[in-house]
Regions:
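NAD(P)H-binding glycine-rich loop region in Rossmannoid oxidoreductase-like domains
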Residues: 23-86, 193
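Conserved beta-loop-beta element that borders a ligand/cofactor-binding pocket
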Residues: 130-152
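Conserved beta-strand positions in the Rossmann-like core of class I SAM-dependent methyltransferases
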Residues: 16
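Conserved Rossmann-fold NAD(P)-dependent oxidoreductase catalytic core, especially the SDR/UDP-sugar
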Residues: 22, 77-120, 134, 142
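Substrate-positioning beta->alpha
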Residues: 124, 172-186
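Conserved catalytic-site region of short-chain dehydrogenase/reductase
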Residues: 64, 98-103, 149-153
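N-terminal Rossmann NAD(P)H-binding glycine-rich loop of SDR-like oxidoreductase domains
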Residues: 1-11
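Conserved small/polar residues in nucleotide/adenosyl-binding loops
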Residues: 198-200
Length: 200
C-alpha cells in the first residue's frame, strides 16, 4: 500500500487511505486523509468512499494469518458491495499472479512449485477473482495481477502489460518491483485503458 500511496500523492491526487493499523501510513501530505477501519466495518468503508472517483483495494488478511483463505473469500465481497453502495463506479484491485497461465491450461496457483505457506492466500484471491469478481457487472473493475515475483526495487516506469498469461523475460523469469507495480496501478487509474483483468 505504501508505494501506491506515494505514487498517488506524488502525482497530486487527493487520497483517503483506509487502514487497520495507522502505523502503516507514515506519509504526511495535505492531500492525504487517513481513516482507521477494518474491512468488516462496512459503514465506515461506504462513508469514506462516497464522492470518490475510484477505490483501490490492497486488502490482504495477512500472509501469516492462519485464516487467510476464509477471510479473503468472506471479506473481498464486502469491499465490492461497499464500493457499490458508496456510488463509486471504479474499483481497482491489487491482484495476484495465481490466475495467470504459465503454460497452456495451467495456472500459476496450480503449479507444483508454489510454496505451501503461500498457497491459501494465492488460491483464495484467485478463487475470488474467478468465481465472484468476473461476474460483477454493476461497476467497472480492474484486477491488476503482478508478475510472479514482486519485490522492493526501483521505480523505472518500464514494464510490459499482458492479459491472461504470465509475462516473463528472455530467461523465463517473471519479476516486477513494487514501485513499478504502483506506477502501473496509478497509470490505469488515470488513463482507464483497460477493463477487467490485466497484469504486468
Amino acid at each position: 500500500i505504501r508505494d501506491s500511496l506515494n505514487e498517488l500523492l506524488n502525482r497530486g491526487h487527493k487520497v483517503t487511505a483506509i487502514v487497520r493499523d495507522l502505523a502503516k501510513v507514515t506519509a504526511s501530505n495535505p492531500n492525504l486523509k487517513v481513516v482507521q477501519a477494518d474491512v468488516t466495518d462496512t459503514d465506515v468503508l461506504i462513508e469514506a468512499s462516497k464522492g470518490k472517483d475510484a477505490v483501490i483495494s490492497a486488502y490482504n488478511p495477512g500472509w501469516k494469518n492462519p485464516n487467510i483463505y476464509e477471510e479473503t473469500l468472506k471479506n473481498y465481497p464486502l469491499i465490492v458491495d461497499s464500493v457499490k453502495k458508496a456510488g463509486v463506479e471504479r474499483l481497482l484491485i491489487v491482484g495476484g499472479a495465481g490466475t495467470l497461465f504459465y503454460a497452456p491450461g495451467k495456472m500459476v496457483m496450480d503449479a507444483d512449485d508454489v510454496p505451501a505457506k503461500l498457497l491459501p492466500g494465492i488460491k483464495s484471491l484467485g478463487e475470488f477473482y474467478l468465481n465472484t469478481l468476473r461476474k460483477e457487472n454493476d461497476i467497472d473493475w480492474i484486477f491488476l495481477s503482478p508478475a510472479a515475483n514482486m519485490t522492493p526495487g526501483e521505480r523505472t516506469g518500464k514494464f510490459r502489460i499482458g492479459k491472461d498469461d504470465l509475462v516473463v523475460d528472455v530467461n523465463g523469469d517473471s519479476n516486477i518491483s513494487v514501485e513499478d507495480y504502483a506506477v502501473a496501478m496509478v497509470d490505469e487509474l488515470e488513463q482507464k485503458k483497460h477493463l477487467s483483468l490485466i497484469h504486468i
